[in-house]
Amino acid sequence: MDNNDTYLHLSSSLQVAHGHLSSPPSQPPLSSMVSHHHPSIINGLGSPYSVITSSSLGSPSASMPTTSNMGYGALNSPQMNSLNSVSSSEDIKPPPGLAGLGSYPCGSPGSLSKHICAICGDRSSGKHYGVYSCEGCKGFFKRTIRKDLTYTCRDNKDCQIDKRQRNRCQYCRYQKCLAMGMKREAVQEERQRGRERSDNEVDSSSSFNEEMPVEKILDAELAVEPKTEAYMESSMSNSTNDPVTNICQAADKQLFTLVEWAKRIPHFSDLPLDDQVILLRAGWNELLIASFSHRSVTVKDGILLATGLHVHRSSAHSAGVGSIFDRVLTELVSKMRDMQMDKTELGCLRAIVLFNPDAKGLSNPSEVEALREKVYASLEGYTKHNYPDQPGRFAKLLLRLPALRSIGLKCLEHLFFFKLIGDTPIDTFLMEMLEAPHQIT
């Protein structure tokens, strides 16, 4: 397929996706082009996934054409609630008793290790609102109180709340926060102290967030997040034991949802269509890698594909891609897990990758650079607002970008090798991306 066909295919995807932005579609927006792509929203990662067993494949050695680095600008300039608030007809009040509380440790410092979160058992970052807790539970409790959110339990109001399942039921998580001793008034007092600050201390990033709202970026992430269970039946029946093939098939599916995601990022659709195509061509590999890395934070020694398949580290090593696979686990997945990167932060990092002013052929690189700067500013303001006790969090997030870029280029090298030897089936859209000229200067 020549480059004109590639351009028409991608630009057509952009135009079709543009008509499906008001809400997550019940039918695949690109069904007229590819009937087997299904963007939707994930319901949880706790259910068992099929595990790809190891197979053998020659180790890649070919190099792709030289491609210079994609810069991310100066590292000088958030985290939103990654959980959807669920309205409820019930008022949330401190319960007279919570099922299963007998097994919970007491919330007092004398009986609970200062290093353990009293709510979920994760690593504690200190005493928050009267209880030793992790940043995740601290932020969840604060958002619940400040936004006066109410939740509903879909089971029997006795859901297990631990490190792996704390996001499953917001109702039971909040009830446990109260039961362990978190104080609503502590959040309210903290907010009052913030209001008493001088008018001169108004966050200078607020105007940037209005131009590049992190809420919209989070919406984009949630709108195209795959329902892994929707793929399970087809994945189980059609899966091979070759992890490289399965990764390529998952990437091909996600390339279509990537178009829809980009159209939801503020101001992307305002760019000329040619520039939209160029930006997606330039960053698709890093955008997909960032997504599946974050999706895999709950997986041990493996990655979770959008198709619901779990690729284990041992399978990747047997297939000859162990080195790059280990880099994904140590430089991306592990780091995201350790800092508890949320969906809004992930979305902002992906938006920074998307708005790449160095992509070759842009009609107005300065306009793209200005959009990237707005994402920087919104992300910085977000982290300051949501993590005031982590002043280095913004810089820590940006430090994932060079690793993502390096890993993205190495993955391209592997894909070019597999395309060259022809042993791995590479589907339509992914093949087009590989055949398109590189857009990085």
UniProtKB/Swiss-Prot annotation:
**Hinge as annotated region, ranges:** 183-206
SMART domains listed in its UniProt record: HOLI, ZnF_C4
Q: Which residues bind DNA?
A: 117-182
Please, one GO biological process term?
positive regulation of transcription by RNA polymerase II
Instruction: Pinpoint the NR LBD domain residues.
Output: 209-437
Q: Which GO terms describe its molecular function?
A: DNA-binding transcription factor activity; nuclear receptor activity; nuclear steroid receptor activity; retinoic acid-responsive element binding; zinc ion binding
Where do Basic and acidic residues bias regions lie?
Answer: 188-200
Q: In which tissues is it expressed?
A: Uniformly expressed from the blastula to mid-gastrula stages. In late gastrula stages, there is specific expression in the presumptive hindbrain and spinal cord. At 16 hours post-fertilization (hpf), expressed in the hindbrain from rhombomere 7/8 to the anterior spinal cord; this expression continues until 42 hpf. At 24 hpf, also expressed in the lateral plate mesoderm flanking rhombomere 6 and in the cranial neural crest, but not in the migrating crest. At 26 hpf, also expressed in retina. At 48 hpf, strong retinal expression.
Keyword list (alphabetical) reads: Activator, DNA-binding, Metal-binding, Nucleus, Receptor, Transcription, Transcription regulation, Zinc, Zinc-finger
Q: Where is the composition biased (Low complexity)?
A: 21-32
Residue spans with biased composition (Polar residues)? 64-89
Q: What does the UniProt entry say about where the protein is found?
A: Nucleus
Residues of the region (Modulating) are 1-116
Task: Fetch the Gene3D superfamilies from UniProt.
Answer: Erythroid Transcription Factor GATA-1, subunit A, Retinoid X Receptor
PROSITE patterns the record matches: NR_LBD, NUCLEAR_REC_DBD_1, NUCLEAR_REC_DBD_2
- List zinc finger spans: NR C4-type: 117-137, 153-177
Q: Where is this region: Disordered?
A: 16-37, 56-94, 188-210
State the GO CC annotations.
Answer: RNA polymerase II transcription regulator complex
Domain of life of the native organism: Eukaryota
The entry assigns this protein to a family as follows:
Belongs to the nuclear hormone receptor family. NR2 subfamily.
Q: Describe its assembly.
A: Homodimer. Heterodimer; with a rar molecule. Binds DNA preferentially as a rar/rxr heterodimer. Heterodimerizes with rarga.
Comment block on domains: Composed of three domains: a modulating N-terminal domain, a DNA-binding domain and a C-terminal ligand-binding domain.
Q: What does this protein do?
A: Receptor for retinoic acid. Retinoic acid receptors bind as heterodimers to their target response elements in response to their ligands, all-trans or 9-cis retinoic acid, and regulate gene expression in various biological processes. The rar/rxr heterodimers bind to the retinoic acid response elements (RARE) composed of tandem 5'-AGGTCA-3' sites known as DR1-DR5. The high affinity ligand for rxrs is 9-cis retinoic acid.
Protein name (Swiss-Prot/TrEMBL) = Retinoic acid receptor RXR-gamma-A
Please name the source species: Danio rerio
State the encoding gene: rxrga
